[in-house]
Amino acid sequence: MFHGSMVALVTPMEADGSVSDASLAELVEFHIQKGTDAIVAVGTTGESATLDFDEHCEVIRKVVDRVAGRIPVIAGTGANSTSEAIELTRCAMQAGADACLLVTPYYNKPTQEGLYLHHKAVAEAVPIPQILYNVPGRTAVDMHNDTVVRLAEISNIVGLKDATGDLDRARDLVARCGGKIDLYSGDDATAMEFLLLGGKGVISVTANVAPAEMHQMCEAAMRGDRAAAEAINARIDLLHRNLFLEANPIPVKWALEQMGLIPPGIRLPLTRLSERFHAPVREALAAAGITLNA
């Protein structure tokens, strides 16, 4: 249903932490011009954890309105409360999003049956295409492949974003449910190999700063052209690593600020990038051929 380079869009903020509507609109245009295949709004990279409910819905609406049907918009609507996830997902559907991305419930550590029933409840309550999101490094819960296979039987669960970076796991998922749902990498460092295994795309942090390159790499990998994919990926490989020197989205927001694309705002408890990481992030941007503001 969705494919290619799907940017995990930052939510640009002014220095006081307010959402910058002007920068948000400019980012949407930047991505469409550079070939990004879909925009994922208000996920982890979009600071969903520090936007309140109304802000969350409003950012989704603004992205959908600005995109105006030119590329798909996938809205992050996960929560660790099933009822809240349902309400956020309903809000996204009403705003006109093409699909929703639902992270596994975090912190309260549900069982596999709890994960199944949570996602089943959201899917049954809101008839919009839904993509599961497994990122155990952040959530403290891991959705096992067996649970994914069960959920793949639900008609409007259409995909999985797997951010584990475990390619053996990805290979097993492709074999067991690749014909029922689409599988997306959520780990830039292993995304190329994930796509060569049969993945349909990547929900990418790197795409915030290198959208054209991520689009080109995805196209090459998905058509099975390893040599072309490797050549493109080599230019952005340092970004895949250095954009995670501190917790995402700290480094990528700083990088976008240096590129002149967003203001400096980020919400507590996240802080601006530590000075010791400025040089490594600049090095990664330079390796990718990205021009910074003077």
Curated annotation (Swiss-Prot):
The record marks T44, Y107 as: Part of a proton relay during catalysis. Its EC number is 4.3.3.7. One of its GO terms (molecular function) is 4-hydroxy-tetrahydrodipicolinate synthase activity. GO terms for cellular component: cytosol. Pathway: Amino-acid biosynthesis; L-lysine biosynthesis via DAP pathway; (S)-tetrahydrodipicolinate from L-aspartate: step 3/4. Gene3D superfamilies: Aldolase class I. It is an enzyme of class 4 (lyase). The active site is at Y133 (proton donor/acceptor), K161 (schiff-base intermediate with substrate). It catalyses: L-aspartate 4-semialdehyde + pyruvate = (2S,4S)-4-hydroxy-2,3,4,5-tetrahydrodipicolinate + H2O + H(+). Pyruvate binds at T45, I203. Homotetramer; dimer of dimers. Belongs to the DapA family. Catalyzes the condensation of (S)-aspartate-beta-semialdehyde [(S)-ASA] and pyruvate to 4-hydroxy-tetrahydrodipicolinate (HTPA). This is 4-hydroxy-tetrahydrodipicolinate synthase. It comes from Thioalkalivibrio sulfidiphilus (strain HL-EbGR7). The lineage of its organism: Bacteria, Pseudomonadati, Pseudomonadota, Gammaproteobacteria, Chromatiales.
